[in-house]
C-alpha cells in the first residue's frame, strides 16, 4: 500500500512539473514579441570616436547617457568604421572607460563586410590586408583566408602593411579577385591625437594600380547601416543615427530615412554645415545634451494599427 501511495505521489509530482514546463514554454511563445513601450519605441545607432570618446578621453556625459540606455532597455548599437578591433576588444575598451556594455552592442565595418561576402558566394575565400578585427569577422562568417587565388582581396585598417603585401594584392586583383574595402575613410585618428592614413587611402592606391573600383560595405553604405538597424528590430522611422561626421554617419542615416543627430564634439563644426547639400535632422553640441526623454519627444508616434499589430504574438 505504501509503495502504491509513493508511486502515485511521484507520478503526480512529475505531471505537475511537466505542466509547469509546458506553461513556461507557452508563455515564452506567446510573449516572445515585446509590446511597444517607452523602452523599445525607438532605437539608436551611435558612432564612437568623436561621439562617446575622443582619442583616449571619454566625452563628458557619454557614460551617463549610454548607461541610462542600458538601464532603460533602449536598443542600440555602436557603429564604427574601424576594422582593427573585435567586438570583444571594443567591449573591453568601453568597460574600462566606465560604460556598462556587452559584445552585442558592437557593430563594426569588418562584421558588415564579412556578412555581406558570406551572402555573395558559397564558401568564399579572401586575401586580407588588415588586423584581428577583420580576420576574426571573416572566419566567424565562414570565409577562408588564403594567399593564392582568392575570390576577394579585402582591405581594412592596419599598421603592418608591407610593400610586398600591397604588390601581392595588386596582382591578385589583376588576376580576377574582386577588391573589397571595409570602408573608404581616407584617414583615421590615433590615441595620441595624430592622424594616420586610413583604409580608403590604401584602397585608393590599389584602385590606381589595378584600374578596378572597390566595393565598400562600411558606412555610409546601406549594407552596414541597414543591417545594424535590423539588429534593433525597428523600422527606419524609429531609428536615430548619432554621429560626428557628415559624409558617413549623417549621409548614411539620411539616405535610409533615419532621424540623424549630429554632435559637434568630433570632426564637424557648426560652420562646416554650409559646405553640404544635405543637413542633419538635429544638431547638438554634445551627447550630454541628449537623454531618453529627448528621443521620446521626437520619435514617430505609433499609429493605432501598429499598436494593435505589434501587441499580437507573431
Feature names for model-found ranges:
Residues 6-8, 20:
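Low-acidity, Ser/Thr- and Arg-rich intrinsically disordered low-complexity segments
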Residues 22-27:
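Hydrophobic alpha-helical signal peptides and transmembrane signal-/tail-anchor segments
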Amino acid at each position: 500500500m505504501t509503495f502504491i501511495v509513493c508511486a502515485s505521489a511521484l507520478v503526480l509530482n512529475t505531471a505537475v512539473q511537466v505542466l509547469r514546463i509546458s506553461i513556461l514554454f507557452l508563455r515564452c511563445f506567446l510573449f516572445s514579441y515585446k509590446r511597444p513601450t517607452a523602452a523599445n519605441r525607438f532605437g539608436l545607432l551611435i558612432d564612437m570616436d568623436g561621439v562617446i570618446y575622443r582619442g583616449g578621453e571619454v566625452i563628458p556625459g557619454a557614460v551617463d547617457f549610454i548607461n541610462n540606455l542600458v538601464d532603460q532597455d533602449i536598443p542600440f548599437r555602436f557603429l564604427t568604421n574601424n576594422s582593427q578591433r573585435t567586438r570583444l576588444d571594443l567591449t573591453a575598451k568601453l568597460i574600462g572607460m566606465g560604460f556598462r556594455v556587452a559584445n552585442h552592442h558592437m557593430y563594426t565595418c569588418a562584421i558588415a563586410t564579412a556578412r555581406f561576402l558570406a551572402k555573395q558566394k558559397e564558401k568564399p575565400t579572401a586575401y586580407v590586408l588588415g588586423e584581428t578585427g577583420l580576420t576574426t569577422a571573416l572566419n566567424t562568417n565562414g570565409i577562408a583566408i588564403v594567399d593564392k587565388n582568392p575570390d576577394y582581396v579585402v582591405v581594412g585598417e592596419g599598421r603592418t602593411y608591407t610593400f610586398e603585401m600591397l604588390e601581392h594584392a595588386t596582382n591578385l586583383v589583376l588576376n580576377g579577385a574582386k577588391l573589397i574595402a571595409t570602408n573608404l575613410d581616407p584617414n583615421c585618428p590615433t590615441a595620441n591625437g595624430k592622424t594616420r592614413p586610413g583604409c580608403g587611402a590604401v584602397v585608393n592606391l590599389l584602385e590606381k594600380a589595378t584600374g578596378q573600383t572597390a566595393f565598400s560595405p562600411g558606412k555610409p553604405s546601406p549594407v552596414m547601416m541597414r543591417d545594424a538597424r535590423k539588429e534593433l528590430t525597428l523600422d527606419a522611422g524609429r531609428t536615430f543615427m548619432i554621429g560626428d561626421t557628415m559624409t558617413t554617419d549623417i549621409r548614411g542615416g539620411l539616405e535610409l530615412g533615419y532621424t540623424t543627430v549630429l554632435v559637434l564634439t568630433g570632426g564637424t563644426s557648426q560652420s562646416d554645415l554650409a559646405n553640404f547639400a544635405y543637413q542633419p535632422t538635429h544638431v547638438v553640441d554634445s551627447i550630454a545634451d541628449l537623454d531618453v526623454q529627448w528621443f521620446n519627444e521626437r520619435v514617430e508616434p505609433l499609429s493605432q494599427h501598429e499598436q494593435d499589430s505589434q501587441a499580437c504574438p507573431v
